[in-house]
Amino acid sequence: MKMFQSFFSNYIDINFFRNATLDQCLLLFYLSLFSLTNLFLIQKLFHANHTQHPLKKYFGETCLLEYIQIILSIVSAALSFYLDTNAVWWAIRTITHLEIVGLNILSSLKYGSTLFSWISVANAFGLLLLRLISIYDFLTYSSWSFSVKGGSFLLLLPLAYNITLFLLVIIPLFFPRAWSPTVKFSKVARPSPEQTCSIFSLIFTYGWLNGIIWKSWKKPITLTDVPALPDTECTQIWYSRFAKNDRKSLMHTILLSLKSTILLMVFLSVLVSSTLFVTPLAIKKLLQYLQNPKSDEGNSPFLWVFVLLIGPYLASVVKELYVHVSRRFMLRIKAAITQMIYKKVLTSKTLFVAVDGSKINLDYVYNLLAKDVDNIGEMREFIGIIARAPLEMGVSMYFLYQLLGWSAYVGLLLAILSSSFPLLVASKISRLTSIANTSSDERIRLTTELLKSIKITKLFGWERPMLSRIQEKRSFEVNNMYSLTLFDIIFKSGMKIAPFISMFITFAIYTKIMGHQLTPATAFTSISMFGLLRYQFIWLASVSRQFIQFKVSLKRVDNFVYGNMVNDSSIESSDSFVFENTSLSWSPTPSTALFQLKNLNFTIPRNQFTLVVGSTGSGKSTLAMALLGELHVISGKMTTPSISQRIAYVPQAAWLRNGTIRSNILFGEPYDEERYFQIIKACCLDSDLNSMNDGDLTYIHSNGSSLSGGQKQRVSLARALYSNAEVYIFDDIFSALDVSTSRKIYESCFLSTLLQHKTIILFTHNVSLCLPIAENVIVLKNSTAQLVSPDSIQELVPSTFFSSNTKKDNIEEENLEPHSFSFDSTLASSSDNDEQRDFASNSSIVLLGLHYLKYFGSNKYILGSILLVMMSQVSLASIHFWIALWSGNSLFSLKLPSSFSFLWGYAILLFIYFLMDLSRAITFAKGGRTASENIHDILSERVLYSPLHWFEKTAAGRILNRFSKDMYATDNLLWASLEGMLLCVMAILITMLNVTLVMPIFMVPAAFVSLLVYLHGYAYSKAQKQLTSLQSSRTSPVFTMLGETLGGITVIRAFKKEKIFEHENMAFIDDMIQPLYISFAINRWLAIRTDGISGLVGFSTGLIALLRQNIPPGLVGFSLNSAIGFNISVLVFVRANNEILTYINNFRRLYEYMLLPSEKNESSCLTKPMNKEWPTLGHVSIKNLTVSYSIGQAAVLEDINLEILPKEKIAIVGRTGSGKSTMGLTLLRFTMIMSGAVEVDGIDINSLDLEVLRQRISLIPQDPVLISGTVRSNLDPFEEYGDGELNEILKTASCESLVQASNKNSLDAFAIHLDTPVDSGGVNFSSGQRQILALARALVRKSRIVILDESTASVDDTTDRRIQQMLRAAFKHATVLCIAHRIKTIVDYDKVLVLDSGKTVEFGSPKSLYTQRRAFWKMCKESHISL
């Protein structure tokens, strides 16, 4: 009763009311009610604003409820002035009410009600501050007394006033807030609940996330279920701000653009540091009271127990608010810099040739987005540590000095020395990190290239050597990672032990030299302070490594974004293309150029048809790039059409986007139905679209992989024609079309009104088709160009350009055969469905964990690792327990050792802890290394030996994600998270055991808290898993967009569609940020609840100790210290458990690939011994052959019977989908033989080892693939031949003119030798040169059986004739099967096989089949060939 009396006498301030008259008291109470009513009216007002209240049309922008608010505010003001009194507290209350009234009116009339909630909160906390004085007086009692003069009425009235005032403080915190879009261009169609929730939900509970938590508990969520991204976080806002504050330095740009956010983070960091000392102070005060209850009668111990309850929660509120703001800071950086990188891609020269001449690998750009952008975002950690570390260290040392006197200076000295340790090892960490990153990038680069060239790898049977190359890179990478990990472990262990050493030396000086008694209050408060220091040192150690990575990433991104800023001042604008003594190069510095066009002097007339011709490798495509402004002007002057003239460009290799055929043709232009179908017909697409189920709405994947080469080219042509541009540049558009389609397109496009009065520049080999309408001709030769009239062209170019056979006499435009292999999609793309699959179930998680441990080490090794975790945690707890015994020595009845013995015991325990902790970390790191090696070896082997059709249906980006993102998580994070979770489990168990031994009743609150934390953790985990999955699925489009842009950058810039692509990319970034933002936010949701719930543990421990007077203070301190650690361990355990689930999911995806069916497992037992030189004859016998691509699918070849004699030259022809390419693949066992057999020199190919089979039979594909390295490594990857032999093969493969080239710097005269560098994919060679090198590669093998799949499609007719002659001479002793698309190339073959729908139609010599006047005769007639 006395406590309640004291409460009323202190809290209600009854003495102030005693001097007031009754009417003044009533009016003040009435004033408070008006203020409270005013708040409720504002709440109604919010809903009126949000739903566009109908009364607004009568009252304008200010609705009726706002008028009511203003009237009530005036009444409140009048009532406040009536309360005229000289009392100071009455004046303060009146001023406070006037402030509320004035701000209410101001917010209503000028700023709108959106601001009101924040104003109310500010005033509410001001009023709350007045109340805290009385609350503190109550809790820090000296005596309980109560006396009221004036009766019970004067008691009830102020009580009602204070209740009203309390509600005035609380209610604004629960009001929802009004929302209006921040920017007009915001994509957000709905407000984020974060922007409309109450202040209480926003800051104190993160209750605005309850909806997504509940949805994820009930069902799988989709992106539409995720709360909208606040429109204040949209990419366009922050990209625009970065662009506005651009200082050509990324660091300066970030600081200027986010300065307000940085200042807020610094302010919150200071608050976080301040709240950290509340709990240690409460422990100290409580222990002092327990040591001597009569020492300070002015303080209530219940206050400090209450602080143990509320202190961790308030500290958590401030800390999580800081983390939330810092995560916003990070995501704003991620969004803006990602867009900056994309904008740089859009504005960089083709091939990304840097100023120094070096080429930036495209994988480099992907790494910038995947790693470096996130590393830069982690600068939030540096802001936090810069603001917090000095303050926390300084305050910790001040408290330590207050506790331990001058001995604390020793600890300060050690702290300074320890804090400088990261600086001393920074260079070492930087070097190791750089080496590890470089080795990882090299492995990813090699893996990427392998995926790009997987078809040629499997065709040539190169799996084993390619696997050896990858494993060699992998071994180097793992060794570097392990070295870095070991150094990091030793470094962090030293940083962790430093505060313990400092504590040991400080206690030794305090007790042995200064002669003081170490009391529990002093000891355990010091432990808390040293714990804060220890945390700072660990943080410094962690951040120092992050800082190194940050600097490296910042430099890389800065160099990319602001590097290569070359402005060609020599390029001017006019009405047409003009070259005046112009020299052009891919590089801005001519000394580093691989190729140049020199001394160009000509003008391309406007609105005329100009034909550009030249031999293979003469530089036609290079000139096309020059016209588009993609080359650098080295000397002279170049003039291009003004920006008002639109340019339409059709590249030689068609570029299409993910989307429908219609969207690819429209390409951002408005839909005009009449013109659209006119273009469709002109491009001969009408029949193709009619054959598709969805017509022009058929969805095509990246680069149109589901379309044939001719279809892709015609869609690309339709896109150009639909744009209705002023200038058209066509780069060899007829090479992918058959003769009939070429003629139709020539007539419907070039001879129609579609291209009338347009500037047309056509690069082509098909001179005879287009010359009749050409008004000008540009002839490319010897790295220069000459503009001539059509009449004089025959004097400058070979006569073969005009021969009757120069037409492309393709049998028919080749569609992709059913299930044929196509692997030209971008490596950045991956299936959303794959990434968005549900995480593994709980049971499968356990199984996956056990599978991982199988690769981690033996059972004994795993058991030893777990024991080391337990021993390290036990040794850590033993240190604190030893200090408890030491500090409570005088309070125990037992005979305990002297203080000197305690010091030695402390030192021994310290050494044991260091040894156990170091051993535990090294053991787990070594196990993680073993697991990484084993997993990658199995993964790479399984993927490399997978059937070719698996690569067809599996996106290349998905495979690359396994070897990069998922492998990185397994290499570095999975074992570390497993270790961290085990540490948390042991810490929780040991904490509960420690406190329970001292206070058995502690098990009750501990069990209750554990249950609550488990339920919250389970809800959190379900939501986090699904958000992580969504995040993965929404990240892929950003990389896919980048890949698409890189593939079609010249097309995008030519059509001037950069703005469309920029906005589309920003939309993708917003979609990527949305689940990531919520994912970070629900971490705050969990942390603030876990801290609040776990605060019950410290509160329960303190309350039990206070109520039970028989527990020694030393053990109470030990229990409290353990209980506070329990809070942290519980939260870390929940997060570690979620991390384990995430990283186990990464391992699950790897494990799925580790179980792929392997071609290597197929039978390789020979039915009879095989000659090492097999096949010696090249005799092929096919008997009753029926094949399909996989089990359960329809047959693609049926009942084929052939007898191919040694050295015979067989041509395989047929219409689209007839099975020509399938026949070639069957000989190499890329299909499944359902019945029949194929024998080579009498041996069934099913009985042969696949690698042997594919190494002995050569298939030259239509699409030549070169691997980075040199010409030598491409011809002879296993180094089996000498230079002399390889040079002879180069000459034989029609490359003699290239090998014997002069020093002229031209592409057709550029000296190719064995050491000539080859870029990835051979991009530094023309398509014709790549095809010639691919032919030379086949010649090196000297195979007895050679399969040619239209291997001359990318060369001009002159080169084609030379290659055909070379093939006849080089393979005269070999059996040749030519899959032909041009009749003219096979008329002199021994036999022709005509296929139709997978069946044999005709088989015999060309002349005999021609005389039969059947299928082959019709093909010859269509190609205008007579035999």
From Swiss-Prot:
PROSITE patterns per the UniProt record, alphabetical: ABC_TM1F, ABC_TRANSPORTER_1, ABC_TRANSPORTER_2
Known glycosylation sites: N49, N437, N567, N581, N601, N658, N703, N782, N842, N994, N1161, N1184, N1324
Membrane topology: Multi-pass membrane protein
Localization annotation: Membrane
GO molecular function: ABC-type transporter activity; ATP binding; ATP hydrolysis activity; ATPase-coupled transmembrane transporter activity
Transmembrane segments: 26-46, 63-83, 87-107, 115-135, 155-175, 197-217, 262-282, 298-318, 345-367, 397-417, 489-509, 513-533, 609-629, 760-780, 866-886, 896-916, 973-993, 995-1015, 1086-1106, 1114-1134, 1223-1243
Name this polypeptide is given: ATP-binding cassette transporter abc1
Annotated positions binding ATP 2: G1214, R1215, T1216, G1217, S1218, G1219, K1220, S1221
Domain ABC transporter, first and last residues per copy: 579-807, 1180-1422
Gene giving rise to this polypeptide: abc1
Key words of the record: ATP-binding, Glycoprotein, Membrane, Nucleotide-binding, Repeat, Transmembrane, Transmembrane helix, Transport
Domain annotation ABC transmembrane type-1: ranges: 262-549, 862-1142
Amino-acid positions noted as binding ATP 1 in the UniProt annotation, renumbered to this chain: G614, S615, T616, G617, S618, G619, K620, S621
Single Gene Ontology BP annotation: transmembrane transport
Family indicated by similarity: Belongs to the ABC transporter superfamily. ABCC family. Conjugate transporter (TC 3.A.1.208) subfamily.
InterPro entries, A to Z: AAA+_ATPase, ABC1_TM_dom, ABC1_TM_sf, ABC_transporter-like_ATP-bd, ABC_transporter-like_CS, ABC_transporter_C-like, P-loop_NTPase
Assigned GO CC terms: endoplasmic reticulum; membrane
Classification via Pfam families: ABC_membrane (PF00664), ABC_tran (PF00005)
PANTHER family: ATP-BINDING CASSETTE SUB-FAMILY C, ATP-BINDING CASSETTE TRANSPORTER ABC1
UniProt keyword Transport, yes or no: yes
